[in-house]
């Protein structure tokens, strides 16, 4: 039997030490409890469970000031749910309908008082038009000239030198700065002068169907010299939304100076009566859904009731104004777009077309053959360029000027065109250009295509045309290819791509991509 251990007697010191330890632990425990009350410990993560749809309270419906994008996630729609797909389909249909409605042409007569363009620049639209009533008749290098005073000075031919001096002497309009003459809201695609010689009145058409009118003869407002805070008022400019898409071309009636015709990519041709202030539809397809963008119009001087037009679908049409607007005879000439065309001013049965198929073609409206879709005017001759041809413009002397993307202005000469019989076959040799002028025609996406426009009835007898220059000028050339002037000036900050001559006076207008007007007189 093992011996019994002797019980250990706890000393006073050891007992006191254990009491102190117990007391200290009690204090620490109390502090921890107090801290938990002030800053609770993070709750332990709850076990995950299957998600259940939240019960959403019905929100108070508020009338939105304008359409806003809404989150499908916040709306409680799952990414692949049928409800979300339907919602997206409806939104897409609404946007497509809005876009289509914006581009849809407006049929019937339009009162200019109802279609004025809104904005500070055009607040006096009706007042501006009232001034017209009663009138009877490759990479660009901005600022770098390609025709200078030296070219004029070194001209040996006296007649040419005098003409160059006169044309180069045209001055940029000074009553208002170019930046203040915003004739239309968007990029200018077309321009023309009113035929009156009393004062320069310019019409411009923009990318979205607005037509602007500016009377350059209007007086400048008087500002007191001692009034330092006075603001210089803007010029009076009228602007009207006559079309729903780009206005591609203007033409005045040969017999009525109060009638101006406009053509548009919205597939319509309209006639504006300046005295009555009414815009009437002259041509439009029978179906409002048919798309037939019109690229240019011209009116025969021998028959002002007829309107000839070209389309971006490669067709040429003839509309008699005395018949209903959808009764035009239309001929398919090419599978490519026709960017521009013109009639011979003295022999308007001769048509010159410029096309994306790289050709200049001459047609004869006196001889139309074929049946159905194969019916078309007689093709007299054609010339093919290296790249697409943008425009073909007849002069009254029988010259055709074209611009093309091979960076050339070509001039063709047909002085005996009036002697051609119907269906005359032009020899290939005669279809060659007599002059080729190097010219940067690379406009890119944001500048309107450069197109030559002849002066219709020059008072001085010199045949000349104007065309925009990518270096922010307007070039003027004679029928033999000699450059006569390069018009510029201070304050021109964009390319005056759309250039146009007054029919008789030496007035030249240029329109920019920002809707600004440059005018030389």
Curated annotation (Swiss-Prot):
Region (Disordered): 36-75
Any single Pfam family the record assigns to this protein: WD40
Function in brief: DNA-binding protein that binds to both single- and double-stranded DNA. Binds preferentially to UV-damaged DNA. May be involved in DNA-metabolic processes.
Keyword flag Oxidoreductase: no
Biased composition (Basic and acidic residues): 55-66
Keywords: DNA damage, DNA-binding, Repeat, WD repeat
PROSITE patterns registered for this protein in UniProt: WD_REPEATS_1 (PS00678), WD_REPEATS_2 (PS50082)
GO cellular component, one term: nuclear periphery
A GO biological-process term: DNA damage response
Family in the record: Belongs to the WD repeat DDB2/WDR76 family.
Record organism: Neurospora crassa (strain ATCC 24698 / 74-OR23-1A / CBS 708.71 / DSM 1257 / FGSC 987)
WD repeat residue numbers: 183-224, 242-282, 333-373, 382-422, 490-521
Entries under InterPro entries matching the protein: WD40/YVTN_repeat-like_dom_sf (IPR015943), WD40_repeat_dom_sf (IPR036322), WD40_rpt (IPR001680), WD_repeat_DNA-damage-binding (IPR050853)
Record protein name field: DNA damage-binding protein cmr1
GO molecular function: DNA binding
């Amino acid at each position: 039997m093992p011996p019994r251990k002797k019980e250990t007697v706890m000393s006073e010191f050891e007992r006191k030490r254990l009491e102190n330890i117990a007391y200290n632990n009690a204090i620490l425990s109390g502090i921890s409890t107090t801290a938990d009350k002030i800053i609770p410990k993070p709750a332990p993560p709850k076990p995950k469970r299957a998600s259940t749809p939240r019960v959403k309270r019905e929100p108070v419906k508020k009338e939105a000031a304008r359409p806003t994008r809404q989150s499908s996630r916040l709306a409680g729609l799952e990414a692949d749910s049928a409800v979300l797909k339907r919602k997206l389909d409806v939104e897409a249909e609404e946007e497509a309908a809005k876009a289509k409605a914006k581009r849809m042409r407006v049929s019937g007569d339009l009162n200019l008082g109802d279609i004025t363009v809104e904005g500070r620049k055009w607040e006096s639209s009706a007042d501006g038009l009232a001034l017209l009533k009663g009138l009877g008749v490759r990479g660009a290098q901005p600022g770098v000239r390609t025709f200078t005073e030296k070219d004029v000075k070194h001209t040996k031919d006296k007649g040419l030198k005098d003409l160059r001096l006169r044309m180069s002497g045209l001055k940029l309009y000074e009553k208002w700065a170019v930046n203040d003459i915003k004739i239309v809201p968007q990029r200018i695609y077309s321009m023309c002068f009113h035929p009156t010689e009393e004062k320069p009145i310019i019409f411009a058409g923009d990318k979205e169907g607005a037509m602007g009118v500016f009377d350059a003869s209007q007086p400048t407002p008087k500002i007191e010299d001692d009034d330092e805070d006075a603001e210089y008022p803007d010029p009076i400019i009228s602007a009207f939304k006559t079309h729903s898409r780009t206005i591609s071309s203007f033409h005045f009636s040969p017999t009525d100076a109060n009638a101006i015709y406009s053509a548009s990519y919205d597939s319509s041709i309209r006639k504006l009566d300046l005295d009555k202030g009414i815009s009437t539809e002259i041509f439009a397809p029978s179906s409002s859904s048919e798309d037939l963008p019109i690229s240019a119009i011209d009116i025969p001087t021998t028959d002002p009731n007829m309107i000839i037009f070209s389309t971006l679908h490669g067709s040429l049409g003839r509309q008699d104004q005395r018949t209903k607007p959808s009764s035009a005879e239309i001929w398919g000439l090419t599978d490519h777009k026709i960017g521009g065309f013109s009639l011979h001013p003295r022999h308007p049965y001769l048509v010159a077309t410029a096309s994306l198929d790289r050709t200049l073609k001459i047609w004869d409206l006196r001889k139309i053959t074929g049946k159905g879709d194969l019916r078309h005017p007689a093709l007299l001759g054609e010339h093919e360029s290296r790249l697409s041809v943008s425009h073909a413009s007849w002069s009254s002397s029988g010259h055709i000027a074209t611009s093309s993307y091979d960076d050339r202005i070509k001039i063709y000469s047909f002085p005996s065109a009036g002697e051609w019989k119907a269906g005359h076959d032009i020899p290939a040799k005669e279809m060659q250009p007599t002059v080729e002028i190097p010219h940067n025609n690379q406009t890119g996406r944001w500048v309107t295509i450069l197109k030559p426009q002849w002066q219709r009835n020059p008072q001085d007898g010199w045949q000349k045309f104007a065309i925009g220059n990518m270096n922010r000028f307007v070039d003027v050339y004679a029928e033999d290819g000699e450059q006569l002037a390069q018009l510029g000036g201070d304050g021109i900050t964009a390319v005056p791509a759309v250039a146009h001559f007054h029919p008789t006076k030496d007035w030249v207008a240029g329109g920019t991509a920002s809707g600004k007007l440059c005018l030389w007189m």
